[in-house]
Amino acid sequence: MHLDGTTSFITGAAHGIGLGIARSLARQGSRLALADLDRPALGAAAAELAELTQVEAFELDVRDRDAYARVADEAEARLGPVSVLCNNAGIAFSEVLDDTTYRLWDLVLGINLGGVVNGVQTFLPRMLDRGAPAHIVNTASAAGLIGAGVGCMYTTSKFAVVGLSESLRHQLGTAGHPVGVTVLCPGGVSTNLARTARSLVGAEPGVGARVERTAPQIEAMLQRHGADPGAVGDQVVDAIRNDRLYVLTDRAGIDLVTRRTDAILAAMPADGRTDAGLDDLRRAAREVP
């Protein structure tokens, strides 16, 4: 997909990976609609990127479907039809089992999964109506491929984003639509994601104090060992241009991915249906009235 002259809509665009993606898209000649909750950082990002391309900035909570639709309308009125959607907004914080309250489940799933769903539901129908080449990038995590080492709320949300992306790409491809889907599964990236969680979980008993205590340590570790957001942005742009499904930023989890895959393969019966049988089932499911 060619990016020069397109319009890109990016959530979580004021910091980290989102800003890295925005910079990379701007260098390719794409106009930018930047969405984020952090108004000061959003303004700074817009001012920086306006040196490269046409930019509009929107304060947006991705959980708010009505607001999402209004912002989408305004962005397209100012910048033209959105053909690249980057569902990047997310929340992460240090989890322990005592944190698994309904309130926090709703918060994590609402942002990390609901924000992606709301982006897809808002923009995909517009993309399909136009019938022109388009692309959707959903930010998941390496934790969406490995069910170990990270809290269950975050991991659940990211596994869901991977599954959504794989299924959506398959459905769009089967139907012949010119809309690609990429799922970004970053490992450690040099961002302030831990710090941005403070405003959302700071008042939660136990969690807020722990986030305040651990955020500086997590950020220092990511600064030392994490991937550069600009390099991640370049990977995403390359995936859009070449219609790649997966983007991974490092090989740190390769042993865990291998063990998980091996365990799944070992759990399969020695005999029974193979891919041909699954193809029959998929075909039958599509033909159900």
Where are each of the predicted segments found?
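Canonical Rossmann dinucleotide-binding motif of NAD(H)/NADP(H)-dependent dehydrogenases/reductases
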Residues: 2-33
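Conserved glycine-rich Rossmann-like NAD(P)H-binding loop of the short-chain dehydrogenase/reductase
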Residues: 28-45
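The beta1-alpha1 cofactor-binding region of Rossmann-like NAD(H)/NADP(H)-dependent oxidoreductases
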Residues: 39-40, 58-70, 102
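Substrate-binding pocket helix/loop in short-chain dehydrogenase/reductase
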Residues: 96-97, 101-106
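Active-site helix of classical SDR
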Residues: 120, 157
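Residue(s) in the substrate-gating loop at a strand-loop-helix junction
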Residues: 141
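SDR active-site lid
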Residues: 171-248
